[in-house]
């Protein structure tokens, strides 16, 4: 379907709105500069972004007593792309609000493509990505693989979290077989349930003393898990659709929470598919960690692991060293890249 062309009047209105936004940002920057030069803001302080609301941020910092306080801050016009988890330099005003003047170097950043295919940061300075899936809605292995590839591309440690294990049959479950395969590859798999006593013990241990981010389909129970992990927080929990068994989105902005036992958790808006269109084929292959010993050992340097003779990956699949299901998942992802 071709895109609808804008009329001359519509283009003028769009350009006018964009110009007004740019002018407001410039006026705000001038006010900030004037206030900073006049000493209306206090000295520079260190803080961490705990939530993002458009042109304003929620920044957490210690007060004079060492207690953590959160302040609503706005950004200098020359600062773009700040996300929850960023460590920043900011200055506070007399009314408790503030202005963020700089971002400190990131240790890690989680990015995913936006609607235009441009990489957009989601969270920063995180130690592990918790990929949450559930017995219901039923997880699809290829979707799990997409999350794993995306995590491997960032260099951030992924952990698989199976939620709603109280719904899992004791024996004969295909899901149990799937989890065993991921464990055999080398991934950590954590079981969780909000309906069973001690059902979150393993998850608590996994989260302690780390900054983690939850990702996963809507409806897998992320908000319910956080409600239990953070009993003082009240998060709206969406109900599963009786028809599609797909969940409703319950979180609208990425937010950082402190866990009672130590560590932090960043909850980000639910997504149903993790786009990988920004990756090249060789990056996808690297994201399948069991492929790595065989990459670079094909007969041809430009082997695409299709029908080429002497393909080390295909030979490994035939020997049973690589699961055929994982190789098929890889091919499905790579084939999707060719249509972008």
From Swiss-Prot:
It is found in: Cytoplasm. GTP binds at residues 163-166, 216-224. Gene3D superfamilies: Nucleic acid-binding proteins, P-loop containing nucleotide triphosphate hydrolases, Probable gtpase engc, domain 3. Residues 20-34 have a biased composition (Basic and acidic residues). GO terms for biological process: ribosomal small subunit biogenesis. The keyword Metal-binding applies. Its EC number is 3.6.1.-. InterPro entries: G_CP_dom, NA-bd_OB-fold, P-loop_NTPase, Ribosome_biogen_GTPase_RsgA, RsgA_GTPase_dom. Monomer. Associates with 30S ribosomal subunit, binds 16S rRNA. One of several proteins that assist in the late maturation steps of the functional core of the 30S ribosomal subunit. Helps release RbfA from mature subunits. May play a role in the assembly of ribosomal proteins into the subunit. Circularly permuted GTPase that catalyzes slow GTP hydrolysis, GTPase activity is stimulated by the 30S ribosomal subunit. This is Small ribosomal subunit biogenesis GTPase RsgA.
């Amino acid at each position: 379907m071709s895109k609808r062309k804008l009329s001359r009047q519509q283009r003028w209105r769009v350009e006018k709105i964009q110009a007004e936004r740019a002018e407001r940002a410039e006026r705000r920057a001038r006010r900030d500069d004037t206030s900073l030069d006049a000493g209306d803001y206090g000295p520079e302080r260190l803080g961490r972004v705990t939530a993002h609301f458009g042109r304003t941020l929620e920044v957490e910092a210690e007060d004079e007593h060492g207690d953590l306080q959160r302040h609503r801050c706005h950004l200098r016009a020359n600062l773009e792309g700040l996300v929850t988890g960023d460590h920043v330099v900011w200055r506070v005003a007399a009314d408790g609000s503030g202005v963020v003047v700089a971002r400190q170097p990131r240790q890690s950043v989680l990015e995913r493509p936006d609607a235009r295919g441009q990489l957009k940061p989601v969270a920063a300075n995180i130690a592990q990505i918790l990929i949450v899936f559930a017995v219901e809605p039923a997880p699809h292995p290829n979707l799990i693989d997409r999350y794993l590839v995306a995590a491997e591309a960032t260099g951030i440690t992924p952990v698989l979290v199976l939620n709603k294990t109280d719904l899992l049959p004791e024996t004969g479950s295909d899901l149990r077989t799937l989890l065993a395969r991921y464990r055999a590859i080398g991934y950590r798999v954590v079981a969780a349930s909000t309906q069973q006593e001690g059902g979150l013990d393993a998850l608590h241990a996994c989260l302690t003393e780390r900054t983690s981010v939850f990702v996963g389909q809507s409806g897998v129970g992320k908000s319910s898990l956080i409600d239990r992990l953070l009993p003082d927080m009240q998060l709206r929990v969406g109900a599963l659709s009786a028809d599609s068994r797909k969940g409703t989105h319950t979180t609208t902005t990425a937010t950082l929470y402190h866990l009672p036992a130590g560590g932090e958790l960043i909850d980000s808006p639910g997504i149903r598919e993790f786009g990988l269109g920004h990756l090249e084929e060789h990056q996808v292959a690297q994201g399948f960690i069991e492929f790595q010993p065989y990459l670079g050992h094909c007969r041809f340097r430009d082997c695409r692991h299709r029908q080429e003779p002497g393909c080390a990956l295909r030979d490994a699949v035939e020997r049973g060293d690589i699961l055929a299901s994982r190789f098929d998942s890889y091919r499905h992802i790579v084939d999707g890249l060719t249509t972008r």
